Amino acid sequence: GSDDGERIPLTICDYNREEGTVTIVFQVVGAATEMMRNYKAGDAFADFVGPLGCHSELCDENIDDLKNKKILFVAGGVGTAPVYPQVKWLHENGVDADVIIGGRNKSLIILEDQMRTVAGNLYITTDDGSYGSKGVVTNEIQKLVDAGNKYDVCIAIGPMIMMKFVCKLTKELGIHTV
């Protein structure tokens, strides 16, 4: 790593306690992430701070209560990275959650294989129809609700515009959204 690098936000997507490693997900947008693209397993950062921010509200709830809730995660693009560990944690504790992953096109759909192993049901949407259902994530939410799914809570993580429209729809549908 370089000692003169800039501070950038990174998302911890997974970890291995035994190996002492974390998996991070990032989108190449500048010099620092361009350099990181070439890192190999075992390469190190000069400095890494985190995690920052707040933990998932789900961590504060009783597992037995969560088992009785119908949970929907909606992930957009790199927003899939912070969704994965939450769904994995729920799965490890016997709680099913449905997941919608959306992206502008197939190349922006990430962590599909990993998510498939922990999600109750996984739905993929792409704006251009290059993979999964054609359209935006809100179309998929509406389809699921129209099919009789009654979600108690929705966790949406992704681009601001996606979260705005997810919250608008879930509010109309009476689904508590985080």
Residue ranges and their predicted role:
Residues 31-178:
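FNR/FR-type flavoprotein reductase catalytic core
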Residues 1-41:
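Ferredoxin-reductase
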